[in-house]
Amino acid sequence: IDPYDVNFLQMSEDPIPTFHSLEQNFTTGYLTVPVVGAGTANTEFEVLTGMSMQYFGTGEYPYKTILKQSDCPSVESIASDLSSIGYGTHVVHNNTATFYSRNNAFSKMGFDTFTSKELMNITEYTPSGSWPTDKVLVNETVKAMDATENQSDFVYTITVGSHGDYPTEKIIENPEITVTGAADEASNNQWEYYVNMIHNTDNFIANLIDAVNRRGEDTIIVMFGDHLPTMGLED
């Protein structure tokens, strides 16, 4: 979520200047997603396949149900459609391959390769220690784009650096961006942590755009968020 859409927050500076610049200069909009606070895989499934989660069971994750069935050899997706016209198709994600059974799901959705955390040189983690930072994804995304010669590529890159949980204690000693306005100290600490993590993601976006531009190949970058954070937002 854009922190400026949270009407009670005040921030020392804009945490996502790259995003706001893109928002002002390129096509943007709101994406309706099927989950809140968790369930990234179901947003992915809807975006990649065009199938609505309302036709599945309550609490179901197709990655872990239909896509694991032996009688479901494949599911049509953006990846399979682009593959059919000659694209190389790749996934890059700085989390474990087996989370949400992505290692199985992506192959059935038409992706040629899946570079997960296990195949990366991870050297930096978020202040909570829970997740790798997203900066590693810049080089890994470019590597996926460079992996094929004389071929267009579709690369689906999934970030994890701004993922929850968001600690109620203050664990960033000197935050780049300070936050005030939440109902209590614990909530304020959570929001300050979240804001600084999406600031890091914004830096990743800027660095990715620079890296892609340096390649000198016509490229379209599309970004979307998976769900709102678990922060007690009601409207």
Regions found by a protein language model. Name each.
Residues 1-235:
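Solvent-exposed soluble domains appended to multi-pass membrane proteins
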